Each structure stands twice: as C-alpha cells, then as structure tokens.
Amino acid sequence: MNFSAILLLALGLAMDATAVAAARGLSVPAIRARHVLLVAGFFGGAQALMPVIGWLLGARIGPRVQAWDHWIAFVLLAFIGGKMLWEARGDGGDDGGEGETTADPFALSAMFVLAIATSIDALAVGITLPMLNAPFAISVVTIGVVTALLSAAGLFAGRRFGALLGKRLDLAGGVVLIGLGFKILLEHLVLS
C-alpha cells in the first residue's frame, strides 16, 4: 500500500470526526485554542490509537468488532445527539438567559465518547493493515494527523456556519450527530 492509498484511507476515516467537530463548532459563540486542541487531540488521537488497538488484538476480536461496530457508533452518536437536542429545547427557559445551554459541548467526557464513536471503524482498519502490506507506523501517524487537521477545520467551518445562522444551532448539531449515527448504521446494514 503506497502513501497515496494511506492518505485516501486517512481521509475516509476522518470524515465522521470532521462532521462531529463541525457540529461542535455550531454550539459555541467563539472558538478558543482549548476547543481546537480538544477536538484535534481527541479525534486525531482516537483515530491513531484505534488502529494500534486493532492491530494488537488482531484476528481474535476482528469478526466481533465488525459485526457490532456500526451499532456501537450509532448508539453513542444518537445518545450525544439526543442530549444536544434535549439541552437545546431548554434554551431561553427558566433562567431568562440568552439561550445558552448549561452543558459544555467540549466536556472531556463528551469529547471522549464522540472520539470513540467516530473512530470505531479505525479499529477494524487496524486489524486489516498488516493484510494490506501497509507500513504500520506511517499509516497510524497519517490517520491521526489527517483526522486532527480536518477535525480542527471542521470545528471552524461549523462555527462560521453557526455565526451566519444564529444561536439555535444546537438543534442542528444534535440532528447532525443523530444523522451521522444513522448513516453509519445504514452503510453497514444495507451496503455490507
């Protein structure tokens, strides 16, 4: 497997994380360095770590992971998306505020769950990398760096989109996450 193929693989794996990062960007009034570091670190780190775990676990759990990865990703993304929708419905409620949600969309626990949900496919890729004769270290680093960069770009794109459309885009972010969960589920159930 040459570097061009590895780069294409990395781009494909990064798409889910980029979409989730864009959804996170919708939910903040301004992007801070902390947000960029969290998004790039969690998503890039998880995408790089999962192939390593997949490679280490190898064929022992490969068939089990592939049989359930889409369900796991769907449940995690639907849960986080549903939580965003629930929090968004409370905007402008009892506190008489400006419509800010109480939860931090960049809380470590939320970022961890989202990073795992968007990187489960990378676990399966890690199992297959040796079969593809791909240089392992180069593949893992490329997957992590590409995901980190695209996720950071997605965060800014989501913020820009949110700035143009106004404050109530937590709803859109929740819908995006739930939609992404359905997309992953349908790809595996229908296209497999």
Swiss-Prot record:
The chain crosses the membrane at residues 3-23, 36-56, 65-85, 112-132, 136-156, 171-191. It is found in: Cell inner membrane. Coiled coil: none annotated. Keywords: Cell inner membrane, Cell membrane, Ion transport, Manganese, Membrane, Transmembrane, Transmembrane helix, Transport. Its main location: membrane. GO terms for cellular component: plasma membrane. PANTHER family: MANGANESE EFFLUX PUMP MNTP-RELATED. HAMAP family: MntP_pump. This is Putative manganese efflux pump MntP. It comes from Sorangium cellulosum (strain So ce56) (Polyangium cellulosum (strain So ce56)). The lineage of its organism: Bacteria, Pseudomonadati, Myxococcota, Polyangia, Polyangiales.
